[in-house]
């Protein structure tokens, strides 16, 4: 008899973390590795945010538990943030804070999914959605988007996938891994469809502040009151404020669902690290100048690297509008190098050149790879040179 649960045996390892682990192993062996696999900014957390955490340690506030669902002061900061960037305010009972947006997503699925409930996920999708749904006995239902439609789902596709078991749809705009952004018109159509059929909307807004070249991010929760009431917003401070190591995520939405998520937090992790909560308060309502500095740096990298990547033999890439990833189709590149599997292709690239990319298979796109441009320009240019040489070899 196996010692492990069915749930764990059916679970896949995160492809992004697995790729990063292999890259770190090669680095430890002395290899020259260029890691473009992890989705984290290369900037140090801004000093004002660091100081807020250190102050809470020095004055003793960080020494103790807080309310499991988050400091009241942090919930108030999130409400202020929503007033400023979303245009509406939320009450404390509509907010739960937890150990990273990834865990908050898990808590949401645990709070609303019953066995065999279906959750519609447009592909490509962020790697953890599907496994978290399955871990909670739900059924992920994938709808394949097209490059021609900029990797965005349509109401017609959603309706074709809908059954009497459909509980929720997942929207991630700007998208990881594609960088696409839904327009207000597209979101309105999807939101009205969800309201009509009483389907919950999970809106993963983690990259909402990172948009480029005049693109605009519209949160679906701002479209109308009925759509807002149907939506649970997932967000955090990791990407916008370069705080991936602080593990601060939160959800905003229906008080009943948020209350259920708060119960799950109280029985699993308890409160988020107290010092990190004080840091998050400063991030959300403190000086925002560094956000624009980082956004401009990402935009410069995007605009510099995109034409170089587009020239790599066998790589076909759509220019992203947000987040910090390229997601090229490498079907021709695989054919040119004699590979039929994208994971074999990325493995060979890593072993031969030291460039770590993420296979698209884990994102539901077996002909694509993901490259993060959340690293310095020198590294990015050298990585493209190595990929070019690999393809021309």
Curated annotation (Swiss-Prot):
Top-level EC class as recorded in UniProt: transferase
Alphabetized GO MF terms: asparagine-oxo-acid transaminase activity; pyridoxal phosphate binding
Record-given protein name: Asparagine--oxo-acid transaminase
Pfam families tied to this protein: Aminotran_1_2
Enzyme Commission numbers on file: 2.6.1.14
Originating organism: Streptococcus mutans serotype c (strain ATCC 700610 / UA159)
Family the entry assigns: Belongs to the class-I pyridoxal-phosphate-dependent aminotransferase family.
Modified residues (N6-(pyridoxal phosphate)lysine): 239
Catalytic activity: a 2-oxocarboxylate + L-asparagine = 2-oxosuccinamate + an L-alpha-amino acid; L-asparagine + 2-oxoglutarate = 2-oxosuccinamate + L-glutamate
GO biological process, one term: biosynthetic process
Domain of life: Bacteria
Cofactor: pyridoxal 5'-phosphate
Amino acids binding L-asparagine: 39, 126, 176, 370
Function: Catalyzes the transamination reaction between L-asparagine and 2-oxoglutarate to produce L-glutamate and 2-oxosuccinamate. Is not active with pyruvate as amine acceptor. May also use other amino acids as substrates.
Keywords: Aminotransferase, Pyridoxal phosphate, Transferase
């Amino acid at each position: 008899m196996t010692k492990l649960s069915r749930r764990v045996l059916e679970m896949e390892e995160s492809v992004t973390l697995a790729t990063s682990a292999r890259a770190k192993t090669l680095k430890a062996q002395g290899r020259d590795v260029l890691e473009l696999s992890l989705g984290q900014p290369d900037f140090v957390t801004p000093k004002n945010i660091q100081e807020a955490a250190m102050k809470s340690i020095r004055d003793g506030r960080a020494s103790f538990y807080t309310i499991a669902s988050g400091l009241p002061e942090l919930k108030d900061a999130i409400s202020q943030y929503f007033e400023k960037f979303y245009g509406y305010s939320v009450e404390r009972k509509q907010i739960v804070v937890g150990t990273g947006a990834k865990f908050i997503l898990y808590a949401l699925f645990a709070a609303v999914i019953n066995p065999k409930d279906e959750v519609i996920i447009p592909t490509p999708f962020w790697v953890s959605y599907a496994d978290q749904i399955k871990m909670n006995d739900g059924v992920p239902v994938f709808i394949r988007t097209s490059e021609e439609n900029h990797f965005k789902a349509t109401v017609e596709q959603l309706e074709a996938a809908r059954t009497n078991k459909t509980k929720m749809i997942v929207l991630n705009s700007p998208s990881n891994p594609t960088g696409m952004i839904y327009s207000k018109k597209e979101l309105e159509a999807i939101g009205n469809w969800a309201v009509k059929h009483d389907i919950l909307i999970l809106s993963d807004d983690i990259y909402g502040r990172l948009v480029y070249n005049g693109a605009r991010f519209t949160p679906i929760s701002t479209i109308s009151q009925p759509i807002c009431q149907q939506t649970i917003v997932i967000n955090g401070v990791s990407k916008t404020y370069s705080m991936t190591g602080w593990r601060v995520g939160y959800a905003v939405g229906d008080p009943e669902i948020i209350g259920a998520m708060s119960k799950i937090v109280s029985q699993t992790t308890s409160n988020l690290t107290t010092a990190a909560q004080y840091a998050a308060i400063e991030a959300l309502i403190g000086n925002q100048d560094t956000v624009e500095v980082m956004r401009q740096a990402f935009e410069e990298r995007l605009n510099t690297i995109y034409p170089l990547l587009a020239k790599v033999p066998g790589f076909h890439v759509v220019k992203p509008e947000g987040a910090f990833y390229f997601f090229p189709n490498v079907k021709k590149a695989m054919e040119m190098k004699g590979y039929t599997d994208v994971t074999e292709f990325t493995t060979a690239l890593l072993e031969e050149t030291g460039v770590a990319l993420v296979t698209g298979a884990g994102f539901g796109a077996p002909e694509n790879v993901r490259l993060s441009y959340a690293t310095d320009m020198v590294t990015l240019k050298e990585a493209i040179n190595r990929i070019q040489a690999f393809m021309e070899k």
